[in-house]
């Protein structure tokens, strides 16, 4: 097999594998959320389908597939169909930039654990050197899917929900982007692999500790909640005011695709937080494990951090009430934005004096 054909085959396998793992993670994040929130509310959560309700995501998926796919007569049909596809496509595209570990060797083939990564001439994995910028750009395009869903539905509830979502996501994107500037100043690179490499050697080298970026981490985490429209920032789908927000006119798999995009974005922001602030796939203590496990353990550490972030998402949902809309916007522009600018100034001073 030629080198180009082999490269394309490996790339195709990685694409299929990452999409499968991501969609499985999305399905079981929903299951975990229902279980944890159920326990918080003194309920059992899913228990009927399979042991401990583990097959509930399969039953939910089957239900969405078999439901009638209604197309209301008053909608703008091309944009109405395009909107959920755009939301899911941007969520899947952003995860393709994220590296999940170092390299994987099978026989004589060595490949980076990343869809867009390749092996360099020096035998080291090479990724896109502006990967972080691309992820921020791609995720910001997702707002178009929500805006199109509200406008094309020709419903006042959908339109109000999409307007809220667009304003909220644009507002919090500013503070989210600025919260990452401190990490970029410390690392001097947009490459996600380079940022992880600079944090290796122990947890004391992680940016949240060694670079004093705990304020930036708080800003990022808070803005990520708003970006993914999660409680307490779920104003676009406030049921008591807007029925179901921009989802109102959707049914069947089109309805499910918006939730798939939301949970996929949750996984993406958890990956980025792990890479930028918590050392990515590097272990907390170097040399902690025997060499035979070193190739597989980085993926374990990375997945463990992602699980911790997703659990915090769920915990916040079961704990905090929803903001009022004016409180939500004021919190972004009057608190998070000045705080993120102050963090940039302090980090720049720290880098200059170091």
UniProtKB/Swiss-Prot annotation:
It catalyses: a quinone + NADH + 5 H(+)(in) = a quinol + NAD(+) + 4 H(+)(out). GO terms for molecular function: NADH dehydrogenase activity; oxidoreductase activity, acting on NAD(P)H, quinone or similar compound as acceptor; quinone binding. It is found in: Cell inner membrane. The keyword Nucleus does not apply. GO terms for cellular component: plasma membrane. It is a multi-pass membrane protein. Its EC number is 7.1.1.-. The keyword Transmembrane applies. The chain crosses the membrane at residues 4-24, 81-101, 130-150, 170-190, 201-221, 269-289, 296-316, 333-353. Keywords: Cell inner membrane, Cell membrane, Membrane, NAD, Quinone, Translocase, Transmembrane, Transmembrane helix, Ubiquinone. Belongs to the complex I subunit 1 family. This is NADH-quinone oxidoreductase subunit H 2. The gene is nuoH2.
């Amino acid at each position: 097999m030629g080198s180009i054909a082999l490269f394309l085959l490996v790339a195709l396998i990685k694409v299929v594998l990452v999409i499968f793992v991501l969609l499985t993670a999305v399905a079981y994040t929903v299951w975990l959320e229902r279980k944890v929130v159920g326990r918080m509310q003194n309920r059992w959560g899913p228990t009927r389908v399979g042991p401990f309700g583990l097959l509930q995501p399969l039953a939910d998926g089957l239900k969405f597939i078999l439901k009638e796919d209604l197309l209301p007569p008053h909608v703008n049909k091309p944009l109405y169909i395009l909107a959920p596809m755009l939301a899911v496509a941007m969520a899947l595209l952003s995860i393709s930039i994220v590296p999940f570990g170092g390299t994987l060797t099978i026989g004589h083939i060595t490949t980076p654990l990343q869809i867009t990564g390749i092996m360099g001439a020096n035998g080291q994995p090479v990724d896109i050197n502006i990967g972080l910028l691309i992820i921020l750009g791609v995720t910001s395009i997702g707002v178009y899917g929500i805006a199109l869903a509200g406008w094309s539905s020709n419903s006042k509830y959908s339109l109000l929900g999409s307007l809220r979502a667009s304003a909220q996501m644009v507002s919090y994107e500013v503070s989210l982007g600025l919260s990452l500037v401190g990490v970029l100043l410390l690392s001097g690179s947009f490459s996600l692999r380079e940022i992880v490499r600079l944090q290796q050697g122990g947890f004391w080298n992680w940016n949240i500790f060694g670079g004093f970026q705990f304020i930036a981490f708080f800003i990022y985490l808070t803005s990520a909640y708003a970006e993914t429209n999660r409680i307490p920032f779920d104003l676009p789908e406030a049921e008591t005011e807007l029925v179901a927000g921009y989802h109102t006119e959707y049914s069947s798999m089109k309805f499910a695709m918006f939730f798939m995009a939301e949970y996929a974005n949750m996984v993406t922001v958890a990956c980025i937080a792990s890479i930028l602030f918590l050392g990515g796939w590097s272990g907390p203590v170097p040399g902690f494990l025997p060499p035979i496990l070193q190739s597989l353990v980085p993926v374990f550490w990375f997945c463990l951090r992602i699980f911790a972030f997703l659990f915090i998402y769920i915990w916040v949902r079961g704990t905090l009430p929803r903001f009022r809309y004016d409180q939500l916007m004021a919190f972004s522009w009057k608190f998070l934005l000045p705080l993120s600018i102050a963090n940039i100034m302090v980090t720049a001073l720290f880098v200059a004096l170091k």
